[in-house]
């Protein structure tokens, strides 16, 4: 029985994430529909609730077409690896108990998220299509650029939390959320997560007018669905990480902790979708100008400020107080 549970545990961990990803796509289509004064999916099942299941079945029963000039092994390996990395990133998350409690969990998440670059680059190169390759190179440059600011913001929050574990963030935010002292960091973090997950207005990799569909232009059926699942799993993961780092969590009971974490992450995910419905796509030079000439100097200045403030106040006497 214990052996069976050991094999079933990863499945029990992955299944709810995939289910959440499926319904996130439905919520996105519904929100975009209502923002454009239309209904969105409303045919399959009650209120269109079974639309993601129908889409998944449709994609996986389609014939997997592979270009004859493509690198066959890498072409199939790239989407599989993308989804595998997206699932691995969830292991240190306290939901409320982590599947794998790591000492350096925040660095582990950052390292695995940077590995997703190789899946995008691999898919673009293996497709043997100029559109896919240009889209992949854009995605790689964009992801690497915005990871610099993400790492600096994480460094600053780690200095305040006093540890690299995600549970340390929950404990240190018991009285005050980090979003209050770090609100400029949070705004830059939110924009950087949009760019990191290749979402609008930073979806330069999928510029229809110039790149058809981006790095996954040659994919259809099952492999395309794997890329789709990986993208939305990364969106949910980034929003959950934003919640843990900046919006704290309740430590009173496990059920309340999970409910509040899910609610805050859902609200941030809705903000992602709202941004997509509201803003046009950036030009590529504007995208790079934003990170290298605006975000990077500002995050460096704020990191120096947050590091130097405690040191500068180290030898000052404590504030006088009177006994009541």
Curated annotation (Swiss-Prot):
- Please provide, alphabetically and separated by semicolons, the GO molecular function terms listed in this UniProt record: NADH dehydrogenase (ubiquinone) activity
Q: Which domain of life is it from?
A: Eukaryota
Q: What class of enzyme is it?
A: translocase
Q: Which InterPro entries match?
A: NADH_UbQ_OxRdtase_su1/FPO (IPR001694), NADH_UbQ_OxRdtase_su1_CS (IPR018086)
Give me the segments passing through the membrane. Answer: 3-23, 73-93, 106-126, 151-171, 175-195, 226-246, 255-275, 295-315
Q: Is this entry keyworded Transmembrane helix?
A: yes
Q: What is its main location?
A: mitochondrion
Q: How does it sit in the membrane?
A: Multi-pass membrane protein
Catalytic activity, reaction form: a ubiquinone + NADH + 5 H(+)(in) = a ubiquinol + NAD(+) + 4 H(+)(out)
Its keywords, alphabetically, are:
Electron transport, Membrane, Mitochondrion, Mitochondrion inner membrane, NAD, Respiratory chain, Translocase, Transmembrane, Transmembrane helix, Transport, Ubiquinone
Q: Which GO terms describe its biological process?
A: aerobic respiration
Identify one Gene Ontology CC term for this UniProt entry. mitochondrial inner membrane
* Job description of the protein: Core subunit of the mitochondrial membrane respiratory chain NADH dehydrogenase (Complex I) that is believed to belong to the minimal assembly required for catalysis. Complex I functions in the transfer of electrons from NADH to the respiratory chain. The immediate electron acceptor for the enzyme is believed to be ubiquinone.
Q: Which family does it belong to?
A: Belongs to the complex I subunit 1 family.
Q: What is this protein called?
A: NADH-ubiquinone oxidoreductase chain 1
Q: Which organism is it from?
A: Aquarana catesbeiana
């Amino acid at each position: 029985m214990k052996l069976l549970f050991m094999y079933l545990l990863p499945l029990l961990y992955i299944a709810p994430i995939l289910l959440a990803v499926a319904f996130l796509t439905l919520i996105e289509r519904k929100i975009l529909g209502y923002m454009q004064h239309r209904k969105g999916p409303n045919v399959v099942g009650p209120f269109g609730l079974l639309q993601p299941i129908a889409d998944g079945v449709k994609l996986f029963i389609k014939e997997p077409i592979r270009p004859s000039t493509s690198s066959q092994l890498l072409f199939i390996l790239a989407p599989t690896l993308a989804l595998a990395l997206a699932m691995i990133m969830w292991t240190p998350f306290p939901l409320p108990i982590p599947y794998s409690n790591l000492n350096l969990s925040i660095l582990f998440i950052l390292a695995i998220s940077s590995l997703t670059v190789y899946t995008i680059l691999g898919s673009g190169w293996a497709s043997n299509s100029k559109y896919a390759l240009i889209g992949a190179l854009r995605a790689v440059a964009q992801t690497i650029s915005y990871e610099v600011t993400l790492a600096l913001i994480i460094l600053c929050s780690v200095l305040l939390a006093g540890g690299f574990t995600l549970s340390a963030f929950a404990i240190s935010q018991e009285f005050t959320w980090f979003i209050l002292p770090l609100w400029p960091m949070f705004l830059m973090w939110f924009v950087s997560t949009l760019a990191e997950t290749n979402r609008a207005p930073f979806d330069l990799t999928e510029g229809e007018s110039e790149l058809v569909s981006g790095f996954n232009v040659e994919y259809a059926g099952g492999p395309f669905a794997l890329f789709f699942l990986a993208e939305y799993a990364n969106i949910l993961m980034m929003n959950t990480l934003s919640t843990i780092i900046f919006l704290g969590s309740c430590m009173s009971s496990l059920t309340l902790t999970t409910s509040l974490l899910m609610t805050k992450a859902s609200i941030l995910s809705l903000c992602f979708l709202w941004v997509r419905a509201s803003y046009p796509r950036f030009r590529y030079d504007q995208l790079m100008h934003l990170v290298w000439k605006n975000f990077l100097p500002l995050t460096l200045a704020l990191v120096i400020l947050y590091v130097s403030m405690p040191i500068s106040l180290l030898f000052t006497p404590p504030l006088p107080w009177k006994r009541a």
